[in-house]
Design a protein with these regions (language model features):
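Juxta-kinase regulatory segment immediately upstream of eukaryotic protein kinase catalytic domains
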Residues: 2-33
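ATP-binding pocket architecture of kinase catalytic cores
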Residues: 36-143
Length: 143
């Protein structure tokens, strides 16, 4: 199951955006990341499209609202950004956030950019893909 949802793929046509527009915005806002040369879509996830951005050998993550008409409080990437940013100076491990854009004219919807953190995503809620000892350690840390 994990291979079906893990990794990246080419960006789906209905979720694509203009990379030149994003780079122009990054430069204009003086966001502390390099120009983006490659964009892939993460395979997993349920609601907000998530992309792997690469620029100058560095990886970043862009999360955005999906295109189309949405309920006002749905897909609140601004809330995600604010929560992750608020956790920066706490013991909770979180990626560094770089920028929140609430102007849908840039790439079609609101979005934010954060640090890419390599790790393991357990798609199965009981983490059946790991051995019993490791699973116990994971569950102990969650409690």
């Amino acid at each position: 199951m994990s291979n079906q949802f893990s990794g990246t793929k080419e960006v789906a046509e209905n979720l694509a955006f203009n990379l030149d527009d994003l780079n122009k915005y990054i430069q204009e806002k003086e966001i502390n990341i390099p120009s983006i040369s490659e964009c892939k879509q993460f395979k997993g996830g349920q609601s907000n499209p998530t992309y792997l951005l690469t620029g100058n050998g560095q990886n970043y993550v862009l999360r955005r609202k999906p295109p189309g008409k949405l309920l006002k409080s749905a897909h609140a990437v601004d809330r995600e950004y604010r929560v992750i940013t608020a956790l920066q100076d706490t013991p909770v491990p979180t990626p560094k956030t770089y920028h929140l854009c609430e102007d849908p004219e840039i790439i079609g919807t609101d979005f934010y950019i954060m640090e890419f953190c390599d790790g393991i995503i357990y798609w199965d809620p009981v983490a059946s893909e790991v051995n019993t000892e490791r699973r116990k350690g994971i569950f102990d840390q969650l409690n």
